[in-house]
Each structure stands twice: as structure tokens, then as C-alpha cells.
Amino acid sequence: MTPRSETHKIGGVTNPRNADRKGKAVAFSDDLVIPTLPPPPIGTLTGQGVSRGHTDDMDMGDWRRFREVGLLNEASMEKKDQEALLEKISTLEKELYGYQHNMGLLLMENKELVSKHEQLNQAFQEAQEILKREQSSHLYALTTVEQREENLRKALGLEKQCVQELEKALREIQEENSKIRLSSEAKLVEANALVASVNGRSSDVENKIYSAESKLAEATRKSSELKLRLKEVETRESVLQQERLSFTKERESYEGTFQKQREYLNEWEKKLQGKEESITEQKRNLNQREEKVNEIEKKLKLKEKELEEWNRKVDLSMSKSKETEEDITKRLEELTTKEKEAHTLQITLLAKENELRAFEEKLIAREGTEIQKLIDDQKEVLGSKMLEFELECEEIRKSLDKELQRKIEELERQKVEIDHSEEKLEKRNQAMNKKFDRVNEKEMDLEAKLKTIKEREKIIQAEEKRLSLEKQQLLSDKESLEDLQQEIEKIRAEMTKKEEMIEEECKSLEIKKEEREEYLRLQSELKSQIEKSRVHEEFLSKEVENLKQEKERFEKEWEILDEKQAVYNKERIRISEEKEKFERFQLLEGERLKKEESALRVQIMQELDDIRLQRESFEANMEHERSALQEKVKLEQSKVIDDLEMMRRNLEIELQERKEQDEKDLLDRMAQFEDKRMAELSDINHQKQALNREMEEMMSKRSALQKESEEIAKHKDKLKEQQVEMHNDISELSTLSINLKKRREVFGRERSRFLAFVQKLKDCGSCGQLVNDFVLSDLQLPSNDEVAILPPIGVLNDLPGSSNASDSCNIKKSLDGDASGSGGSRRPSMSILQKCTSIIFSPSKRVEHGIDTGKPEQRLSSSVAVGMETKGEKPLPVDLRLRPSSSSIPEEDEEYTDSRVQETSEGSQLSEFQSSRRGRGRPRKAKPALNPTSSVKHASLEESSKDELSGHVSVTSKKTTGGGGRKRQHIDDTATGGKRRRQQTVAVLPQTPGQRHYNLRRKKTVDQVPADVEDNAAAGEDDADIAASAPSKDTVEETVVETLRARRIETNADVVSAENNGDVPVANVEPTVNEDTNEDGDEEEDEAQDDDNEENQDDDDDDDGDDDGSPRPGEGSIRKKLWTFLTT
């Protein structure tokens, strides 16, 4: 026999108290406290010593078998010990895993039980609250009932007084009737007899009433008054007749009031019935409470059954642990095979095994003792608590039953007493009626009786007061009982809390089991758990002491209640004795009054028959109604009991259904919650992703907006810089225009002097021919048109100080400058300089062609004609606006041209003025064809500028509509003229503005030449002539030609605006086409020169009023001299 086997045999502990008192045995689960003890160490088999103290139980036959087998050899035993230790280790590990699994299951079950327990506690608390409410309602109903009883008693007293008054009235009426019936003589005789009787009985009255001497005098007075009344009877007869009539009327009124009072009594009885019904309801509530108490007892029984089931489960877990031990043995066999491979670990294992053996023995000893102590203590505590709880419940039940029975008996007794008192009062009323009938005869006796009655009434009132005080005491006792019930409920709640604490302790013990089973891994934690268990035992001992103190306090309170009950019983017995005495006294008085009433009934029976019949009918109705009420109360009590039983059953069924529904609801809610949680998590993830995307998009948009804002700011800065540059350029242009004006004036003066000198030479006979030859050679004087060299009015208006300047124009100009892409902001200041360079550095001048690159505002036909004398060369169309790609000049070229312009500004101005004032000269001979490369280049430029002509020609045409009708007609004539003869003139007709646009396209005919000198188209054709006649291949000259085209277009626009503003007439020069290129050029030149001189003179007279357009000799040599001077 091992300690484990002994511990397995301990299945349950029965409490002898429960067994003795009710025959109930409470089985407690050992699985919550007792862990499965490990097997005994193998050292017990070697005979070295047994530490368990169970050697007496061992069988000697087993030892013999061991010796026979050879198990007692030390070597084999050591090996077996090692194997057993390894097996034990494996078994312990398996047990640990099994116990952990079981503990997990137990924890799950524990959670379920905790939830169920919480639900039951909630139901119990609700039931307690309902009980408290019902108790408060019951107390309130009791107080109301008692108040109503007092009110009813007061009402009864008032009704009795009314009845007495009515009886008095009836008596008086009866007396009047008797007096009316009897004759005066009979009345006198009766009066004498009454006086004699009064005198005879006065001695008896005097003997009885020594205590009231004052009333004796009153009796003597009344006797004398009776004597006087006898004498006055005759006088009263007439008065009584009149009073009879009044009394009849009063009788009718009294009967009406009596009926009203009867109705009031009926209503009062109905109220009493309602009160009785409320009392029955209160009884029902009390029965319900009893049923709830019974339900609680049933629940406790169920808990006991659950504990038994737990014990069974523990046994099952023990069997499972044995199976796990078998599995562990199998694993140990496998470990033995592994031990052979790991000899190095055996030394450490042996040392650890010795330590584990010692530690196991200590643990086994401690566990065996401590666990058994804890189990015994807990079982004893639980048994004592259960017994106390059951005893308390039984005592409370008994006390409640007794109190209810007492209350019911008291109510019934009170009812019986009330009925008896009513009957007695009725009898007393009858006796008093009889006595009042005899008042006239026996007033002295009646007064004495009245005194005695008054004294008795005082006694009764004192008794009633005492009864009311006793009732108050009873109420206070009831309240104290209710307080005790509340305390009992509190104790129950505390007991439930303690049960919860015990369950928690059981849980902690289970946790300790787990920790003990894991002692191989958690040896250090075992000590702390043992300390915790000790602390817990101390806590349990303290709780036991507290419970004992509470029990003692409860017993003391119960003893106090018993004492109060004993005092109450004594008082009750005393009250019952006093009641019996009072009833005896009432019986004696009733018998005496009956004897007196027997003498008077004969006289009053006839008059009181009607009243008795009414009273009897009323009493019969009252008794019938009371019996019916009692039967109803009994039936209602039985119904209430049945209803309570049905309520119990329904409540049990509802509780079971609620539990099932709650479990189902919990499962459904958990599933729904998981579904919702997953859905919400998915939604949250999607929202997060969407938010991240939106944030990324917002960040990208924000970065783009920031970049755009930065670009806009940069662009604004550029625009501001460009506007500043534009304003600076405009200011520079204004200064240049002013300088040019001054130089023109100087040049005009020099020109006038030169012309005067030429005229003087012409007048000379010998020098005239030379001068004519000089003039006809190349020199053509420019016209002194000062308006054309001035900057345009729009440019002057756009100056910073002008009033016509606008921001929109500045912004447009700046944007156009940006679009050009190559220093477009500097071009307005370079236009005039580039014009000067175009005049000076013209390639036609180097080859000594007769091309006049004069003023772009007023081109004469002579220069155009000279340029168009080359055969096989097509005129190029002029681009009337600046293009950023083709007509723009690079910055390096502009710098180069600026440097060249600064050197040759004076010479360019001279040539410009000469060409502007020169008339249509005589055409020269055609030179050889130009270089084909230049023509190809100009053709490409023509193609690139073709597309832009259509959109920009209208700009110049609109500006020239004011005074350019002749120009337009002249261009159309030159465009459609075909082949003409030499010096062919065309009549110029005025044309309406906007009729036709300039036709600037290149003509297919070779010799067709446009010859407008003064307008934009003429300027463009001059540019084309200059580009076509350029024989040089230098890139500098080509760029100069391109810049000349752009600058001349600008100056043409300015000249047109100036001419339109100044209304200056424009001379249309008829073109001349050279069809013949004969070698006899001298004759043709002479004739053409004469014609040209005449035409130029006519044109100059028409336009300017000057004769400066005639050819003069010596102009070609001056031009050459200026060219050589400037180039060198």
C-alpha cells in the first residue's frame, strides 16, 4: 500500500452533523485540492529505509519474490533505479502535459461555471430586491390596515353614540305614547308607586353609592323634581300632544339619517372587504417569498450535486493520469536507448536525481500533510457553513410560518372580538334601552349604574390604550424582525460572497496543482506557492474565526428574539386573562341586565318589534357577508398557494429557458462580433489604403502646386525683369531718336550747303558736265523726312512716364520676348542701329551696284529698279513681323552688329538721308547673275516665312489705310503688269481703304518688279533686293541682311503711323522695267535720266514741295568716298 493508493481511496467526506440532523451527506471534490501524488521512491525497495511509515502494511511475500528474482542486488538495483528515475521523469513530464491539458479544460469549465454563477447571483439579488420591496409593501399595508382599524373603531364609537341618541329619542317617544294612553289617574297612581319604589330602593342605592355622596344630593334633587313633575303631568299632557307631532317629524328625519348611516356602513364593509383582499395579496407575497427560499434551497442542492459531479470528474482525471503514466513509461523505454548514447550526462543526472529524490520526499511529505489539512479544514468549514445556513433557513422559515400563523390567528381573534364586542354592545344597547325606559322610575339606580358604566368605560379605554401600546410594541417587534430578516439576507449575501471566495480559493488550489506538477521546471515557484498557500490557510482560519463570531452574534440575537418572544407570549397570556375577566364581567352584567330586561320587555315588545326586525335583518346580512368573506379568503388563499406553485414551476422553466437562450445568444453574439470585427478590420484596412492613396495624391498635388507656384513666381520675376528691360530699352530709344533728330538737322544743313555747292557747279559751264556725271553715277540724295526717323508713337506712349502706357501691353511684349528665346528684349534698342549697318555694310555697295539702301520709310523707285535689273533673280517676299526662329538675331551677332554700328553711325545716317531724298534714278546695266548659294538661302527663308505673311500683312495695311490708297493701287498695278516697255508709267487711281490687301507673293515673271518706295511693301521689296544682290558668302553679312529685314519692318510701321498722323502725302513712283540690256547704255541712261528727273521733280513738288529729287552730278563719287572712309 502506497500513500497514493490511500489518497485515491479518499473519495468524499460526509459531515456527521448533516447526517445526524437531516440525513444528508455532502460530498466534496478531492480533485480541487488533492493532487495526484507521485509513486514512492525506489529506495524503499532496497531495504535501506522507508520514509512513509507504511512498512507494517507491506507484504513479506513480495519481499521474498523480489529476492528470488534478484531485484535486491545493488548493481541491478542501481540500474533499475536509474531507469525508474528516467521513467519517473518521463512520466512526470507526461503528467505535466496531461495536467496542463486538464487544467485548460477545467479553466474553460470554470469560466462557464463562473458565468452561470454570476447569472444565478444576479437572479438571487433580484429576488432579494423583490423580497425587500414586498416586505416594505407588506409593512406599509400593515400600517395602513392598523390605521384603518383605528379609524373604523372611531367610526364605531360615533355610530354607537348615534345609536344611543336614537334610542333615547325612541324611549322618549315611547314614554309619550304611554303617557298618552294612560289616563291621568293611572299616571298619578303610577307616579305614587314610582315614588314609593324610588323611596324603597333609595336605601339600596345609598348603600351601593357611598363613594359618590355628591350624586346622592343630585338624586334627592331629582326625586323632588319628580314630585314636581307628577304635579305638572296634567299641564304637560297638552304640551306632549304638540310635542308628539314634532317627534313624529323628528322620527322621520332620524329614520332618514339612519338609512344613510346604514349605507355608510355598507360602504365601510366593502372597504373592509378590499382591505381583506389586500391582506390576502400580502399573504400571497409571503408565500412567494417562501417559494423563493425553497428555490434557493433547491439551488443549493443542485450545487451539491454539481460538487459530486466534480468528484466524479476528478476520478476520471485520475484514471486519465494513470494512462498518461503508462505512456510516460513507454517514453522512458525510448529514453533508455538514448541514455546509452549520452554517458557524459549520467554524472550530472545522478547528482540531480539524488537532489530530486530528497526534494520529492520532502514535497510528498509536505503535500500529503498540507493538502489533507487544507481539505479537512475546508470540508469542515463548508460543512459547518452549510449546516448553519440550512439551520438558519429552517429557523427563518419556522419563524416566518409562526409569525404568519400568529398574525392570522390574531386577525381572526380580533375579528371574533370585534364581533363579540358588537354583540355585547348591542346587548348593552338593549339593556340601556330598558334602563332608559325605567329612568323615570329608577333614576337613582340608573345614575349609580351610569357611574359604574363610566368607570368601566374608563377601564375599557385604558385597556384599549394599553392594547394600542401593545400593538405598537408588536409593530416595533415586527420591524425588528424585518431588520433581522434583512440582516439574515445580508448574512446570506456574505455567505454567497464567501462561497465565491471559496471557489476562488479552489481555483487558486488548482493553480497550485499546476505549479506543483511543474516542479521540474519551476522549483523556485513552488516555494512561493507554498508560502501563498500558508497565507491562504491563515486567511481561511481568520475567515473561520469571523464566521464563528458571526455565528455567535447571530445566536445572541436569536436568543434576544427568543426572550422578546417569551415576553410577548407573557403579555399575550396576560391580555388573554384580562380579556377573560372582562368577558366574565360582561357575562355577569349581561345576566343581570337580562333579568332587568325581562321585566321591561313585555311593555316594549310591541313598540320595538319593527326595530328588532330591522336589526336582526341587518345582523343577518352582516353575518352572511362575513361568512362569505371568510370563505372568499380561504378560497383566495388556496388559489394563491396554487398560483405560487405554478409560478415556481414557470419560474424554473423560464430560468432554464433563459439559461439556454443566454448561451445561444452568447454564441450568436460571439459569432456576430467576430464577423463584425473582421468586416470592420477589412473596412479599416481598405479605408487606410484609400487614405494613404489620397494622402499620396494630395502630397503629389501639393508638390505640383508648390512647383507651379514657384514657376509662377519665377515667371512673374522674369516678367518684371523684362518689363524693366523694356522700359530701359524704350528710354534708350527715346534718347537715340532725339540724337538722330539732332543729327538730321545737322545733316540737313550740310545737305543744303552741298546742294547749293552742286548748283553752283552746275551753273559753271566747264564743271557742269562733270557734276551731272557725278550725280547720275550713283549718288542719290535722301529726302529730308524728319518724321520717319522718329520712334513710333506707340513706343513713345509706352514710356514709363507717358499716360497711355498700360500693363497689358507690357506683359504682351514681355511674353513675345520670352517666346523669341534669344535676347528679344534688346531688339527695340537695336533697330535703328541695325538699319544704319544695313545701309553701310550693304554688299551691293561693295560691288558698286546702283542699289539705294536708303531710308526704309520712303524707298524711291530708282533703288528698286537698280536692284531688279539682275536677270534670273526672283524677288523675295518680306515677313512683316518678327519671328522667333527665322528673323531673330543671336546675341553674338547683335553684339557684332552693335560694334559695327557704333563705328559707322555717321556714314549710315548720311547714306540714309541721301537715299531718302533721292528720286527715281536711271537704271543701270544688268550685272552678272548672283551667287546661287545666296538665292537658295533666300528661297529657304522665303518658304519659312510664307506661312506667316497671311496673318500679319493686314497689320500694316490697316495702318496705311488713312493715306495709302495710292500705294495700294500702285502695288496692284505692278503685280499685274506683265512685261512692260522701258519707262512705262501707270496712272495711279485713288482706292477705298480695305478694298484689297497687298499682294506680296513672288511673281512668276522674271522681269516684273514692285516699285513702291514709301510704304511697307516697298520696304520689304528693298530688303529682298538687297538679299538677292548679295554676292558675299560671309555669315556676318547674311545675319545683317536678316536683321535689316526685321528692323525695316518695324521702322516701316513707324513711318506709316507717322505719315497717317501727320497727313503727309506719299508719292507713288512708277516702276521702270529694263527689258533690253544693250551695250549702248549711255543713250538709254541719258533718256531715262531726263525722264526720271522730270518725274522726280513732279513727285517732289507734289509730296514735299522740294526740287531735291532731280539727279545731280557728283553724288556717286561722294557715296564711294563715304563708303571707303567708313570701311577703312
From Swiss-Prot:
InterPro entries: CRWN. Its main location: nucleus. Residues 1012-1025, 1076-1108 have a biased composition (Acidic residues). One of its GO terms (cellular component) is nuclear lamina. It is a peripheral membrane protein. Keywords: Coiled coil, Cytoplasm, Isopeptide bond, Membrane, Nucleus, Phosphoprotein, Ubl conjugation. Expressed at low levels in roots, leaves, flowers and flower stalks. It is found in: Nucleus membrane; Nucleus, Nucleoplasm; Cytoplasm; Nucleus lamina. It comes from the Eukaryota. Residues 73-365, 391-730 form a coiled coil. Residues 847-858, 870-882, 939-950 have a biased composition (Basic and acidic residues). Residues 904-914 have a biased composition (Polar residues). There is a cross-link at K340 (Glycyl lysine isopeptide (Lys-Gly) (interchain with G-Cter in ubiquitin)). A motif (Nuclear localization signal) lies at residues 966-973. The keyword Electron transport does not apply. Disruption phenotype: Altered nuclear morphology. In plants lacking both CRWN1 and CRWN2, moderate dwarf and leaf-curling phenotype associated with endoreplication and strongly reduced nuclear size. Plants lacking both CRWN2 and CRWN4 exhibit slightly smaller rosettes. Plants lacking both CRWN1 and CRWN2 exhibit markedly smaller rosettes. Plants lacking CRWN1, CRWN2 and CRWN4 are extremely stunted and set few seed. Residues 1-22, 38-59, 806-829, 847-1128 are annotated as: Disordered. Core component of the LINC complex which is composed of inner nuclear membrane SUN domain-containing proteins coupled to outer nuclear membrane WIP proteins, the nucleoskeletal CRWN/LINC proteins, and, possibly, KAKU4. Component of SUN-protein-containing multivariate complexes also called LINC complexes which link the nucleoskeleton and cytoskeleton by providing versatile outer nuclear membrane attachment sites for cytoskeletal filaments. Required for nucleus structure organization (e.g. size and shape). This is Protein CROWDED NUCLEI 2. It comes from Arabidopsis thaliana. The lineage of its organism: Eukaryota, Viridiplantae, Streptophyta, Embryophyta, Tracheophyta. The gene is CRWN2.
